[in-house]
Amino acid sequence: MSEDRVTLADLERIVAARAQADAGASYTRSLLDKGISKCAQKLGEEAVETALAAVGSDKAAVISETADLLYHLAVLLHAKGVELDEVHAELARRTRQSGHEEKASRQRS
């Protein structure tokens, strides 16, 4: 991790480290202690805020809300025990075919 850039892999490591901290000192730990439903709720809120910022004209707001969204996604993935490499593998699988083929191949629920 460089001082001016944090990758998603860095964020995954930061969340994992902060998950081990005391809840009084770590927002990440306190969020995880509230359970998966709260983590999912926060992710949803940040997704909406990002979408709303995107329809506005303030690029800085989009950047800020996207950072919040990515953080809350990293927390949710950690809470579910999903590693970023697993998401990368799924993205690789999907990019081996066209978007229409990939969508058609998903199981309907």
Swiss-Prot record:
Location(s) in or outside the cell: Cytoplasm
Q: Which InterPro entries match?
A: HisE, PRib-ATP_PPHydrolase-like
Write the Enzyme Commission number(s) for this entry. 3.6.1.31
Q: What does the record give as the reaction this protein catalyses?
A: 1-(5-phospho-beta-D-ribosyl)-ATP + H2O = 1-(5-phospho-beta-D-ribosyl)-5'-AMP + diphosphate + H(+)
The UniProt similarity line reads:
Belongs to the PRA-PH family.
PANTHER family for this protein: HISTIDINE BIOSYNTHESIS BIFUNCTIONAL PROTEIN, HISTIDINE BIOSYNTHESIS BIFUNCTIONAL PROTEIN HISIE
This chain belongs to the protein called: Phosphoribosyl-ATP pyrophosphatase
Q: Which organism is it from?
A: Azorhizobium caulinodans (strain ATCC 43989 / DSM 5975 / JCM 20966 / LMG 6465 / NBRC 14845 / NCIMB 13405 / ORS 571)
